[in-house]
C-alpha cells in the first residue's frame, strides 16, 4: 500500500515573492506527502544547482517551470511504483537519473521536493509524525534555536556588512521558554530601535534591518536588549554572528565597507577575536570566505576551542567537502541546508558525518522560505541539537518554531532541551 502511484509538481511562491517548486507524492493507500523547497540569497559556489527557467519575460528569469517539468516527466516516470518506505533507494535513483555532479540537469530543487515529499508520505503511511519516522525512538532532543534579530548583508537593504546577528537562548529550561525568551528580546529590541528613531522594518529572515554606523553597534544593542528583557547575557542568552564573509571577500581581503576597513585574513581573525572578548559570542558562521581555507585554519586555531565556528558556504552540506575540512581541521561545525545538497538521504549523511567527527550540525532555513516545516522535524529526528530558522516575525519563520513547539508537546515528559550541551565541541 506504500507504492507511489502519482507524483505532481507545481510552481508556488516563496517568502521573497520568487517562484519555487512544490511536489506531491501520492501512495496507493491514498496517503499524500507534500513538500516545498527553499532558496538562498547568499549561495555557496559549490551548492547543488537550483534549476531556474532563465526566461526574462517571466518572473525576471526566476521561474521554475523547467524543474516542474523534470518532476512531472522523468522523475515521475522513474519512481512510479517504487515503495515510499525505501527512502535511500529512491534518493539514489534520483541522483543517478540526474547523472550530473551537482544535480544541474534535473535541478536540485526538483529532486529535493520529491525526496522530501516521499518521506512525508511514508511517515503518514506509517501513522507516525515525521520526526519519529525519521529518527525512531531516540528522537527526543529539542534544538537550541539561533534567532536572527538583526539582518544585514544581502538579506537586507542596509549598510551592515555582516549578514546576521542572532541570539541563542541556551540557558533556558525548555524550548517553550527559549521561544518566549526570543520573542521578548525581539520585542525589547524593537523598543530600543524606536527610541533611537531607527527603522523597525525587517529583512528576509524577519530580523530588524536598521542602518548602523558600524557593524559592532548591532552587537551592543542586542546585549542591551537581552539585559532589558530580563535575561542574563552569556549565561542565559548568547550571541551568534553569520559573517557571510564570502560576500565581502575581494582580491584577497575582507572589505568591511561600513567600518571603512580592508583586512587580511589574519587581521580579520583579530577583528573577530576582539568581538569575542567584548561580547558573549558563542558562534560565528562563515567567519572566513569559502575560498580562504588558509584563513579558516587561522580562525580555527585562534578561536576553535571556545567558539563554534560554522561552515556554511565552505561545506555546502556536502560530505566530500566536509570530509576534507575535517581532515584539515577547518571549522568545528557545519550548517545543514537541505537544498544545498538536494536529497534527504545526503542531508542525513552530512549530519551523521559531522557528529562522528565531533563537529556540531545546525539544521538551517534559507532566506527564501515557504510554510514547509520539514527542517524542524529533521532537527529533532537527528538530534542535531541546534536549529537556525530566522527571527520571531514572518510566518514562514514562525511556522518552524510552532512545529517545534508541537513536537515538544507531543514528546511530553520525554522531551529534552539541549541548552548549553548543544555546543559539545567547546571547552567549558
From Swiss-Prot:
Active site residues per record: 205 (proton donor), 337 (proton acceptor)
Sequence intervals crossing the membrane: none
Entry EC no(s): 4.2.1.11
Molecular-function GO terms, alphabetical: magnesium ion binding; phosphopyruvate hydratase activity
Which prosthetic group or cofactor does it need? Mg(2+)
Q: What does the record list as coiled-coil region(s)?
A: none
**One term under GO cellular component:** extracellular region
Q: Quote the record's binding site residues for Mg(2+).
A: 242, 285, 312
Enzymatic reactions: (2R)-2-phosphoglycerate = phosphoenolpyruvate + H2O
Keywords noted in UniProt: Cytoplasm, Glycolysis, Lyase, Magnesium, Metal-binding, Secreted
Pathway field: Carbohydrate degradation; glycolysis; pyruvate from D-glyceraldehyde 3-phosphate: step 4/5
Enzyme class, one word? lyase
Q: Name one GO biological process term.
A: glycolytic process
Q: Where does (2R)-2-phosphoglycerate bind?
A: 163, 337, 366-367, 388
Record's subcellular location: Cytoplasm; Secreted; Cell surface
Enumerate the SUPFAM superfamilies for this protein.
Enolase C-terminal domain-like, Enolase N-terminal domain-like
Query: Has UniProt tagged this entry with the keyword Secreted?
Result: yes
Claim: Cytoplasm is one of the keywords in the record: yes
The family this protein is said to belong to: Belongs to the enolase family.
Job description of the protein: Catalyzes the reversible conversion of 2-phosphoglycerate (2-PG) into phosphoenolpyruvate (PEP). It is essential for the degradation of carbohydrates via glycolysis.
Q: Which NCBIfam families match?
A: eno
Name of protein:
Enolase
Biological source species = Nitrosomonas europaea (strain ATCC 19718 / CIP 103999 / KCTC 2705 / NBRC 14298)
At the highest ranks, the source species' classification is:
Bacteria, Pseudomonadati, Pseudomonadota, Betaproteobacteria, Nitrosomonadales
Amino acid at each position: 500500500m506504500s507504492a507511489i502511484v502519482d507524483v505532481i509538481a507545481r510552481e508556488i511562491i516563496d517568502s521573497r515573492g520568487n517562484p519555487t517548486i512544490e511536489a506531491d507524492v501520492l501512495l496507493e493507500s491514498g496517503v499524500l506527502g507534500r513538500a516545498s523547497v527553499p532558496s538562498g540569497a547568499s549561495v555557496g559556489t559549490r551548492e547543488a544547482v537550483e534549476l531556474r527557467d532563465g526566461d526574462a519575460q517571466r518572473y525576471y528569469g526566476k521561474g521554475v517551470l523547467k524543474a516542474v517539468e523534470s518532476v512531472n516527466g522523468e522523475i515521475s516516470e522513474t519512481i512510479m511504483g517504487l515503495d515510499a518506505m525505501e527512502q535511500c533507494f529512491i534518493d539514489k535513483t534520483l541522483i543517478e537519473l540526474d547523472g550530473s555532479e551537482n544535480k544541474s540537469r534535473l535541478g536540485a530543487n526538483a529532486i529535493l521536493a520529491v525526496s522530501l515529499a516521499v518521506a512525508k508520505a511514508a511517515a503518514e503511511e506509517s501513522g507516525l509524525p515525521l520526526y519519529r519516522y525519521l529518527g525512531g525512538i531516540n528522537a527526543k532532543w529539542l534544538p537550541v534555536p539561533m534567532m536572527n534579530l538583526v539582518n544585514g548583508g544581502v538579506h537586507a537593504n542596509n549598510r551592515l556588512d555582516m549578514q546576521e546577528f542572532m541570539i541563542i537562548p541556551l540557558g533556558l529550561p525548555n524550548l517553550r521558554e527559549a521561544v518566549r525568551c526570543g520573542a521578548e528580546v525581539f520585542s525589547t529590541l524593537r523598543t530600543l530601535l524606536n527610541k533611537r528613531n531607527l527603522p523597525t522594518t525587517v529583512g528576509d529572515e524577519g530580523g530588524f534591518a536598521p542602518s548602523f554606523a558600524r557593524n559592532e553597534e548591532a552587537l551592543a544593542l542586542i546585549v542591551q536588549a537581552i539585559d532589558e528583557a530580563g535575561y542574563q547575557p552569556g549565561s542565559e542568552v548568547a550571541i551568534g554572528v553569520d559573517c557571510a564573509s564570502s560576500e565581502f571577500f575581494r582580491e584577497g581581503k575582507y572589505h568591511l565597507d561600513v567600518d571603512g576597513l580592508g583586512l587580511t585574513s589574519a587581521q580579520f581573525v583579530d577583528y573577530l577575536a576582539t568581538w569575542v572578548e567584548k561580547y558573549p559570542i558563542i558562534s560565528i558562521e562563515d567567519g572566513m570566505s569559502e575560498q580562504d581555507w588558509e584563513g579558516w585554519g587561522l580562525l580555527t586555531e585562534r578561536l576553535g576551542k571556545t567558539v563554534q565556528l560554522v561552515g556554511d558556504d565552505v561545506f555546502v552540506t556536502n560530505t566530500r567537502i566536509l570530509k576534507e575540512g575535517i581532515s584539515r581541521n577547518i571549522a568545528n561545525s557545519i550548517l545543514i541546508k537541505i537544498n544545498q545538497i538536494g536529497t534527504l538521504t545526503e542531508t542525513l549523511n552530512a549530519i551523521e558525518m559531522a557528529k562522528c567527527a565531533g563537529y556540531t550540525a545546525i539544521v538551517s532555513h534559507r532566506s527564501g522560505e515557504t510554510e514547509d516545516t520539514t527542517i524542524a522535524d529533521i532537527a529533532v529526528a537527528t538530534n542535531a541539537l541546534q536549529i537556525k530558522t530566522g527571527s520571531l516575525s514572518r510566518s514562514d519563520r514562525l511556522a518552524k518554531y510552532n512545529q517545534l513547539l508541537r513536537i515538544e508537546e507531543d514528546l511530553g515528559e520525554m522531551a529534552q532541551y539541549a541548552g548549553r550541551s548543544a555546543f559539545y565541541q567547546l571547552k567549558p
